[in-house]
């Protein structure tokens, strides 16, 4: 099995059915594997379009958006879309080509420091140079080593208190399928206090799933607002950054009694 075939096998294992892409020299082996894998590929007119199409797909379906491009300038053209996805908390996976391993760092044809460029606009970015590296295992070991030197018990206690106060989990044996909005709202409705507010970030507010949730939420007696916020769990104190006067007015009207806040994120 080649690396490209392994990529397709991983995508299929995670129930990915649709990819957006723009081909180029270094990514062609992946396109060959894509053809054999039988996944749907939508050809865009440029790499920027592939990223934006993947974002739109994720917003409208609630599934992860996947886009592919070639190395160098093809990959750098994705950066705007990656930044947009990160700022709006949209799930997007990007796969790019790369020059041959011996040529990395030699200013080869269509080579760019895509890893360095993407670190600032992605949650995770890495180069796979060997199929023998167990990346997931290495990350787990590294995180466990870091935790040994951290005093995290105060954090754990804070989380335990928060979970005890707002006891809510949504667990359903549905694999990687999108969350059922009605089931989620029914669960929230049974647990919410009378003066609860649902808060979402701007990008999440635009996703199909959250749109559906918030539309139904209003009929369940929730107050809904869109803002950036950080919950400080010390007797339910709130530090809130608002983006418009309209949001501020809504909060002033609703936060008189400092209600509990349910965050969709």
Curated annotation (Swiss-Prot):
Cofactor(s) it depends on: Mg(2+); thiamine diphosphate
Binding site for thiamine diphosphate: 47
SUPFAM superfamilies per UniProt: Thiamin diphosphate-binding fold (THDP-binding)
Record region (Thiamine pyrophosphate binding): 204-247
Entries under InterPro entries matching the protein: THDP-binding, Thiamin_PyroP_enz_TPP-bd_dom, TPP_enz
Keyword Protein biosynthesis found: no
Keywords in alphabetical order: Lyase, Thiamine pyrophosphate
Top-level lineage group: Bacteria
Pfam family of the protein (one): TPP_enzyme_N
Gene Ontology molecular function: any one: thiamine pyrophosphate binding
Co-factor note (free text): Binds 1 Mg(2+) ion per subunit. Binds 1 thiamine pyrophosphate per subunit.
Keyword Lyase: yes
Record function comment: Truncated acetolactase synthase; no longer catalytically active.
Assigned protein family: Belongs to the TPP enzyme family.
Protein name: Putative uncharacterized protein HI_0737
Annotated organism of origin: Haemophilus influenzae (strain ATCC 51907 / DSM 11121 / KW20 / Rd)
């Amino acid at each position: 099995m080649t690396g490209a075939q392994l990529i397709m096998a991983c995508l299929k294992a995670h129930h990915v059915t649709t990819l957006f892409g723009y081909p180029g020299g270094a990514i062609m082996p992946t396109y060959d594997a894509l053809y054999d894998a039988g996944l749907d590929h939508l050809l865009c007119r440029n790499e920027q379009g592939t990223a934006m199409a993947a974002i739109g797909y994720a917003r409208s379906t609630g599934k992860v958006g996947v886009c592919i491009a070639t190395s160098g300038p093809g990959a750098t053209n994705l950066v705007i879309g990656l930044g947009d996805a990160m700022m709006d908390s949209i799930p997007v996976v990007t796969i790019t080509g790369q020059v041959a391993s011996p040529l990395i760092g030699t200013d080869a044809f269509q080579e760019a420091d895509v890893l360095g460029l993407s670190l600032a606009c992605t949650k995770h970015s890495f180069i796979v140079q060997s199929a023998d590296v167990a990346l997931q295992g290495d990350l787990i070991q590294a995180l466990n080593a870091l935790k040994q030197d951290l005093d995290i018990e105060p954090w754990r206690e804070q989380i335990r208190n928060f979970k005890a106060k707002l006891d809510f989990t949504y667990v359903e044996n549905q694999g990687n399928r999108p969350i059922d909005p009605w089931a989620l709202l029914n669960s929230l409705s049974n647990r919410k206090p009378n003066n609860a507010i649902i808060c979402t970030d701007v990008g999440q507010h635009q996703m199909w799933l959250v749109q559906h949730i918030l539309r139904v939420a209003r009929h369940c007696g929730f107050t809904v607002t869109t803002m950036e916020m950080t919950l400080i769990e010390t007797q339910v104190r709130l530090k809130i950054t608002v983006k418009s006067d309209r949001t501020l007015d809504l909060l002033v009207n609703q936060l008189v009694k400092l209600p509990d806040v349910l965050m969709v994120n």
